[in-house]
């Protein structure tokens, strides 16, 4: 099984509840696109399920650059879309600037807290789920070495890594954890080539189970792990179907 932020899709669903049926909701995906097989796609799945269940519609946009964050927020707010849901912590700064200008618009941000009366912040205890992943990886490992590949090097992803390492240690303190971050910019969420390279490097160090908390970059991790006949663990959405029998 894969680790899932079970409430991510639900957050998009709740935020676009029937109480807002008069106004059309909007969903803004983070960089990487809505079909990243991870974080964005789970938000899209939740919103689409709401649309299917209620017969209502929602607007959406896939960002191409950082500069579009505030533009997209203002565009939807000006159009009267309500609520406006953002998939990702990186919207925090733009939302802080925009929310006060549209007090009658409800905003929802995932993975970050923005303190404003018209903002609902949805955050998770990533380290707790990752602790269980670490226990599972330790139990599955035959080499005594497991790996972790994060996306952007930020406190959020370090919480994933920390919980994972503690879970491994709880099962067997002698197991080695090899950890790498993909990068320090938002591009780290959508670099499957780099994910593949890091996976190969960790395999060369003996890792036979690798956990990816890296958004779209994780696609490269899971693919390479399957190609090299080792196990992987996905994140944010159920990724077992991508490589049956190879994804825990």
Give residue ranges: language-model regions.
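Gram-negative bacterial Sec-dependent N-terminal signal peptides
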Residues: 1-23
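A residue-level marker of the well-folded mature domains of exported/periplasmic proteins
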Residues: 20-248
């Amino acid at each position: 099984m894969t680790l899932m932020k079970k409430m991510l899709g639900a957050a998009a669903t709740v935020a676009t509840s029937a109480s807002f049926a008069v106004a059309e909701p909007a969903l803004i995906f983070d960089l990487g696109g809505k079909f990243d097989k991870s974080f964005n796609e789970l938000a899209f799945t939740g919103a689409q399920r709401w649309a299917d269940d209620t017969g209502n519609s929602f607007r959406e946009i896939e960002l191409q650059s950082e500069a579009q964050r505030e533009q997209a927020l203002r565009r939807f707010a000006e159009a009267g879309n309500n609520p406006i849901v953002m998939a990702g912590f990186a919207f925090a700064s733009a939302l802080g600037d925009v929310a006060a200008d549209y007090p009658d618009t409800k905003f929802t941000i995932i993975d970050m807290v923005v303190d404003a009366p018209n903002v609902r912040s949805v955050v998770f205890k990533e380290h707790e789920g990752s602790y269980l992943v670490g226990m599972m990886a330790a139990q599955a490992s035959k080499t005594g070495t497991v790996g972790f590949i994060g996306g952007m090097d930020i406190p959020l992803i370090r919480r994933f890594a920390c919980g994972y390492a503690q879970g491994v240690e709880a099962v067997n303190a002698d197991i080695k954890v090899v950890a790498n971050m993909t990068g320090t910019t938002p591009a780290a969420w959508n670099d499957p080539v780099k994910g593949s390279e890091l996976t190969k490097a960790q395999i060369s160090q003996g890792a036979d189970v690798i956990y990816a908390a890296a958004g779209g970059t994780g696609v490269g991790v899971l693919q390479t792990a399957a190609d090299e006949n080792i196990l992987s663990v996905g994140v944010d959405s159920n990724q077992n179907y991508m490589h049956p029998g190879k994804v825990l």
